[in-house]
């Protein structure tokens, strides 16, 4: 499924685990009753109207039980919406408009928003973790993956 390529393996595992915890009968689908029971198990009582509203937000094909692919599609929609915000943040940090964040740009940004300021070693560790192509800078896609993986 193409939407699965949008997520990291770790994200898919988390989503699948959450899905399975709600899918009480293990049939690969979440019914309104299972969703209501899941909320009740954490002491949240929802009206049938609210459950129906939540199901409709995810159930794109109108089949009513929601399968895992529909959950992934909804999550991808949510993340795409956040993507525009991530791009704006990246553009604000990319002060030289090079299309990548240099260690200096990242250091300046992180020093301004952390107290006490992050050390060079801490910033270098962030760059190393996020820098997928090992060029010493963080490109836009790497930045987005870094932000998404922190959730």
From Swiss-Prot:
Keywords assigned: Calcium, Metal-binding, Repeat
Paired cysteines (S-S): none
SUPFAM superfamilies registered for this protein in UniProt: EF-hand (SSF47473)
Binding site for Ca(2+) 1: 23, 25, 27, 29, 34
Binding site for Ca(2+) 4: 131, 135, 137, 142
Coiled coil: none
Tissue distribution of the protein: Found in cell lineages giving rise to the aboral ectoderm, a squamous epithelium covering the surface of the late stage embryo and larva.
The organism's place on the tree of life at top rank: Eukaryota
One example GO MF annotation: calcium ion binding
Domain EF-hand, first and last residues per copy: 10-45, 46-78, 81-116, 118-151
Residues binding Ca(2+) 3: 94, 96, 98, 100, 105
InterPro entries reported in the protein's UniProt record: CALM/Myosin/TropC-like (IPR050230), EF-hand-dom_pair (IPR011992), EF_Hand_1_Ca_BS (IPR018247), EF_hand_dom (IPR002048)
Function, as annotated: Calcium-binding protein involved in larval development and metamorphosis. Likely to function as calcium buffers mediating the transport of calcium from the sea water to the blastocoel where calcium is required for skeleton formation.
Cited PANTHER family: CALMODULIN LIKE 3 (PTHR23048:SF0), MYOSIN LIGHT CHAIN 1, 3 (PTHR23048)
Name under which the protein is recorded: Calcium-binding protein SPEC 2C
Biological source species: Strongylocentrotus purpuratus
């Amino acid at each position: 499924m193409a939407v699965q390529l949008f997520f990291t393996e770790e994200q898919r595992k988390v989503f699948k685990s959450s899905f399975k915890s709600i899918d009480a009968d293990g049939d690969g689908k979440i019914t309104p009753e299972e969703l209501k029971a899941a909320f009740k198990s954490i002491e949240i009582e929802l009206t049938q109207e609210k459950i129906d509203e939540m199901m409709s937000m995810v159930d794109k094909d109108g089949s009513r039980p929601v399968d895992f692919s529909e959950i992934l599609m909804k999550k991808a929609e949510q993340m795409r919406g956040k993507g525009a915000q991530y791009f704006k943040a990246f553009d604000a940090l990319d002060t030289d408009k090079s299309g990548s964040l240099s260690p200096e740009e990242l250091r300046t940004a992180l020093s301004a928003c952390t107290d006490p300021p992050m050390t060079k070693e801490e910033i270098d560790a962030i760059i190393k973790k996020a820098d997928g192509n090992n060029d010493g800078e963080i490109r836009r896609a790497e930045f987005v993956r870094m932000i998404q993986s922190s959730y």
